[in-house]
């Protein structure tokens, strides 16, 4: 039996990805096309007002100063990458470009998830399925996590990118990949709380992948290090802010609140 040309296979796979993404855009548009409401509408209007009265570079400088406040522990929580940056806000000037931004970020996160699935399964079919499932999860992100500016999608994007760097580190043994993985995990945790969950999932993944607890800890160490650094900032910010972010050891209460939040998301 004659083998299929690899170039044709890659082209066919690309067409399938585009077809799934096109279907996802139609599926997602009901959820992600609505204008921002509530607190998100207020924050977006505030940002756009500042951008309208300043030059781009003035706003970028103001944005950088606001993010530095997180590293100086002057904010109640450590999420310096939570809000869209000055470049991202350029897409928020019209509802059409705003929708395209949300769709693009969602698609980029789903694509990286599919690459992780491809590496784990060594199957393009499984990777394509993971791509579709990640896109299908976007409505849960939007409804349950206030993703008017793609916060959970961006968190997932950085987390999946850090996982891919771990695979490169595992293959090449080049420490530079470990450094990049740690930085990406730090950004993921500094974007939204789910970044911490993804970092712990990375540990679980590598324990299974290496079939060893010690091997999993060693392989996932960069991501865990990035998570630990973000948590130190977050914990220190909570202590200084005094806004209810203190570390709680009331496990039953933590479990109750977690279940309530998950139920609200669904």
Named regions from a protein language model:
Residues 95, 99, 127-161, 165, ...:
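Aromatic- and kink-enriched transmembrane "portal" helix at the membrane-lumen/periplasm boundary
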Residues 177-192, 202:
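Membrane-interface alpha helices of multi-pass inner-membrane proteins
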Residues 197-227, 231:
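Perimembrane helix-loop-helix junctions
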Residues 100-122, 161-165:
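Transmembrane-helix motifs of polytopic, lipid-linked glycan transferases
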Residues 159-178:
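Membrane-interface transmembrane helices that cradle and orient dolichyl/undecaprenyl
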Residues 37-47, 52-90, 227-266:
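Membrane-lumen/periplasm interface segments of multi-pass, membrane-embedded glycan/lipid transferases
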